[in-house]
A protein has these predicted regions:
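N-terminal acidic leader/helix
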Residues: 2-35
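Inward-facing hydrophobic residues that define packing positions of alpha-helical scaffold repeats
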Residues: 20, 52-53, 66
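Short E/K-rich amphipathic alpha-helical oligomerization segments
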Residues: 28-49
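Amphipathic alpha-helical coiled-coil segments
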Residues: 59-73
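Short, charged, amphipathic alpha-helical segments
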Residues: 49-57
Length: 73
């Protein structure tokens, strides 16, 4: 079951922390992957690689907001 399948019930603080932790790890994994692939894609298209690098930066910003949300719980 995927996490958005449980949207029908109120989350406890523990569940919210668990969800945020999962999202943070997920985003960090994507950010790393984006950077690795951007390096490979540079050979095909410098512009596309720059776009992917920017996506990694934006993902990092999303992750920081999720960390803030975790602190604000």
């Amino acid at each position: 079951m995927h996490s958005h399948d449980l949207m029908g019930h109120d989350l406890t603080k523990h569940e919210a922390e668990h969800l945020l932790h999962h999202w943070i790890e997920h985003n960090e994994s994507h950010s790393t992957s984006f950077r690795e692939r951007a390096a490979q894609i540079t050979r095909v298209s410098e512009k596309a690689a720059q776009d992917i690098e920017q996506a990694a930066v934006l993902m990092d910003q999303c992750t920081e907001m999720l960390r803030k949300a975790m602190q604000d719980l």
